Amino acid sequence: MRVDYGDNIAVGEGTFVNYGLVALDVAQISIGAHCQIGPNVQLLTPVHPLEPTPRACSLEAADPITIGDNVWLGGGVIVCPGVTIGDNCVIGAGSVVTKDIPTGSLAVGNPARVLRQLDDSTFGPRHQHPPQETPQ
């Protein structure tokens, strides 16, 4: 994991972070409990002016990122400044999240857009592990 400061990051219990996370924590980054962070995810809080003169002054500014509980960020996801991702969301691999994602959403793409809402009834038998039988 690579961080800017390391002081502005809170990670909830049971969260798994894979290889290559970049967390630019100029502002607060909050990651909920029981999240799964895929490889090479970027959490980017810094913001920069578009206008040349203010940008040349190198003033540091940032907007916080909030990730709810039980969120899965697929590999290579980029979360932009000021974004909140609600609880129980799945963000598809390679997505660029530029706006808030409501609780229980499946979002994909660049920019990420919500495809549908998720709940326990969404998942059929192929998503459940069968009970293990003990050999006789």
Predicted regions and their residues:
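Short-chain dehydrogenase/reductase
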Residues: 72, 90, 96, 106-108
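Flexible, glycine/small-residue-enriched loop-and-beta-strand segment within the central core
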Residues: 1-11, 16-84, 110-112, 116-129
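C-terminal catalytic lobe of FAD-dependent flavoproteins
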Residues: 134
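Short glycine-rich donor-binding/catalytic loop of glycosyltransferases
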Residues: 94-95, 100-102, 111-112, 118-119
